[in-house]
Amino acid sequence: MADSFDVIVVGGGHAGCEAAAAAARTGARTALVSMRRDMIGAMSCNPAIGGLGKGHLVREVDACDGLIARAADRAAIHYRMLNSSKGAAVQGPRVQADRKLYKAAIHDLLAELPSLEIVEGSAERLLLDDVSRGTSGLVLADGRELKAGAVVLATGTFLNARLHFGMDCRTGGRVGEAAAVGLAEQLRALDLPIARLKTGTPPRLDGRTIDWARLDRQPSDGEGWTFSALTPHRLVPQLACAITRTNQRTHDVIRAGLDRSPLFSGAITGVGPRYCPSIEDKVHRFGDRDGHQIFLEPEGLDDPTVYPNGVSTSLPEDVQLAMLRTVPGLERVEILQPGYAVEYDYIDPRALTAGLALRALPGLFCAGQINGTTGYEEAAAQGLAAGMNAAAFAAGRPEIHFDRATSYIGVMIDDLTLQGVSEPYRMLTARAEYRLRLRADNAGTRLTSWADAHGAISAARRMFHVEREARRIAMADCLDRRIAGSAELIAAGAAVAADHARRSLTEWLRFPEVGDAELTVLAPELVDVPEDVRAEVIQDGRYAPYLARQDQEIARLRADERIGLAVIVDYGAIAGLSNEMVERLNAARPADLAAAGRVRGVTPAALAAIMVHARRLAA
């Protein structure tokens, strides 16, 4: 085993795997350090990838040649497009994955990277350089020293972590795995801004003890879409999920057990995720609801384990079983593993740059739950960004920043580093101002060439993208050039009103009655264009007037981005800013005026004062 690398990544979860792969794809000699080699790529909680907002992140990681979408397709036993009845901008691709197949897929994809080495061991502490006052490597628990130009911490829930099973509290980052205590103590000793968060997971059920006949069946989508642009068709047999609901009897059992809940006894102090609350929290906060949905999700093709999505809990196991057996279809259910909560340390992400580098320790990057986020997809996206930037730092290249106007990854990193978090951060489509441009179906168009310019994609991805772009541009040109009147549209089957105007087919797409079927009648050559390319070009045409309006907004954003704020050392020196604004701006360190405007509580008047001060300092 080598002991010197360009980049070391600590943690083999979704963030760590993407970080290691991203660094290795650029040619950096990379070490992926994990306590257990066999747990690399494990799905710790929900056996699913994607969802609203989250599916956009997965497609963006895939556009940059990441792993998560390809692994999801190799393991997908259930596909579902969420919000399918709404506009394309807010539709969310999601798959249910076979845990074993997903982990195997990640191992196979990592094995394809020649400059990546997996190191089995527990990270004990960082090596610090007295001269650069930065990070120079890692010390493992067994005493081995690994040197590197950059280190990525992707420790998930393992930093100083504690597991809660009812009132039973024990040290651990996941069931059966130790917490990272030494590393957590070192980070606290370095006086970094560290606090606690909490997450939880539901009990795992024995599917052989579920009465499936009593439940609402939810089949996989019939359409043939896949997550990765490189996956031509679905690869795995499909399974159905099922839906049931809690009821008043369930809620009575939960309320009777709250005195034994660590969440309500004060044993848990960390804040949990707003958008994935525990079932006891739901019952407590929404006591007037007559029930809450439970999605019963199979964990694999040959695995009887079922994940009951919607009942995350840290109640004692006997209460969990009593609660579940009040639910229709679960009257005789058996628990294979009880649900539990985990509390862990995280670093205030306002201490990070837009490249996810820790300002206080040059060469140290952070990704995933250590930055205060929740979810596989958020972790994978940060891992991609941190890995690209760690490799760039080790090679002496400038930071690489994802743009808020062109990616959900940019939205997330901007939110984290400017606003910080008070609860685990989850991606939502509502967080993106320019979401009409940031559709899941056009991630490759938005990001693959950009990632290629930073040396982050493979030759196979580049070839695929070049061919796809040629087809997309050719189709868009065809629709722009082909002119038709309403009579021709009506003859093609479109229920449009008869008028005397002649329009390009692109303009006709603004009429909801005109779709793919009508276009292929008027332009038969489009039949040979791949379905995903046709869908993207059609959506571009439908949104065209609104996209033009957003382009004007983005132009104003770019103007403000040209007013840099690096010259401002202390915002307290600017007259007219409140103490609260000064505190938030000093913590966030916005790079430009546009970023300062996104810091919570900063007013237009304050922005004017900041701009004047910055120009005076730069003069």
UniProtKB/Swiss-Prot annotation:
Binding site for FAD: G11, G12, G13, H14, A15, G16
InterPro entries associated with the record: FAD/NAD-bd_sf (IPR036188), GIDA_C_N (IPR049312), MnmG (IPR004416), MnmG-rel (IPR002218), MnmG-rel_CS (IPR020595), MnmG_C (IPR026904), MnmG_C_subdom (IPR047001), MnmG_C_subdom_sf (IPR044920)
Database matches in SUPFAM superfamilies: FAD/NAD(P)-binding domain
Subunit structure: Homodimer. Heterotetramer of two MnmE and two MnmG subunits.
Subcellular location: Cytoplasm
Keywords (A to Z) from UniProt: Cytoplasm, FAD, Flavoprotein, NAD, tRNA processing
Co-factor requirement: FAD
Function comment: NAD-binding protein involved in the addition of a carboxymethylaminomethyl (cmnm) group at the wobble position (U34) of certain tRNAs, forming tRNA-cmnm(5)s(2)U34.
Assigned GO CC terms: cytosol
Membrane spanning stretches: none
PANTHER family: GLUCOSE INHIBITED DIVISION PROTEIN A, PROTEIN MTO1 HOMOLOG, MITOCHONDRIAL
Pfam families associated with the record: GIDA, GIDA_C_1st, SAM_GIDA_C
PROSITE patterns to which the protein is assigned, alphabetical: GIDA_1 (PS01280), GIDA_2 (PS01281)
Protein's recorded name: tRNA uridine 5-carboxymethylaminomethyl modification enzyme MnmG
Native source species: Rhizorhabdus wittichii (strain DSM 6014 / CCUG 31198 / JCM 15750 / NBRC 105917 / EY 4224 / RW1) (Sphingomonas wittichii)
A single GO BP: tRNA methylation
Similarity remark: Belongs to the MnmG family.
Chain residues that bind NAD(+): 272-286
Superkingdom, taxonomy of origin: Bacteria
GO terms for MF: flavin adenine dinucleotide binding
